[in-house]
């Protein structure tokens, strides 16, 4: 498969829930995730970010959008999210995964850089995660011999990550840190006094991080 540089680089955002959500009971977790999805949709609507689908699978959200980088940066401010990764989506076929990794490596790696590949899978596939990593590394070194690239599994300049989920695969090289905490709106409202300058604002922000919508009082 030959990939064109004119093709949009990222078409998906992998949205990871905050760790606190994962340790809740099934009923509470479902409630929190539902609220989080509502908050994500509200942010996308507020910034007029187009998207085709927002799917919850395997304890994550997968946002299909042609504005993946912009969406990830805006959503990183949503309480309840731990991190977000603009990603390329493809099928779970080994050849297509490797082709996408080589394409992304060509855009991200510079002369003399080191790199690593990591792979995580959910489901049954005719290959192992280690086989994916070895093939990705081999093909990248083969594709860009003039860059003087090297593999470094401890402190690479660029890490190419592959997540295989049943019949789909997602390739990315970045993770944008989220603010964590709980989804805004899962706790009762609180009154926040804004007369104490920066300290009052910080206290209000921390209350929001615990899921409490603020009632601002000047």
What are these regions (language model features)?
Residues 2-193, 198-218:
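RNA-binding accessory domains that recognize and position tRNA/RNA substrates
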């Amino acid at each position: 498969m030959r990939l064109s540089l004119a093709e949009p680089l990222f078409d998906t955002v992998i949205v990871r829930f905050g760790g606190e959500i994962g340790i809740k009971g099934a009923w509470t977790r479902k409630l929190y995730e539902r609220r989080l999805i509502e908050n994500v949709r509200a942010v996308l609507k507020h910034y007029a970010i187009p998207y085709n689908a927002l799917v919850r699978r395997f304890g994550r959200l997968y946002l299909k959008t042609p504005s993946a980088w912009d969406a990830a940066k805006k959503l990183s401010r949503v309480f309840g999210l731990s991190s977000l990764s603009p990603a390329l989506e493809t099928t779970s076929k080994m050849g297509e995964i490797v082709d996408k990794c080589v394409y992304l490596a060509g855009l991200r790696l510079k002369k003399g850089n080191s790199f690593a590949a990591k792979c995580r899978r959910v489901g049954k596939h005719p290959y192992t995660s280690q086989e994916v990593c070895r093939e990705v590394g081999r093909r990248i070194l083969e594709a860009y011999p003039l860059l003087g690239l090297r593999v470094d599994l401890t402190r690479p300049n660029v890490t190419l990550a592959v997540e295989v989920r049943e019949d789909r695969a997602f390739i990315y090289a970045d993770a944008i840190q989220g603010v964590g905490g709980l989804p805004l709106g899962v706790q009762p409202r609180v009154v926040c006094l804004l007369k104490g300058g920066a300290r009052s604002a910080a206290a209000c922000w921390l209350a929001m991080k615990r899921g409490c919508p603020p009632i601002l009082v000047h």
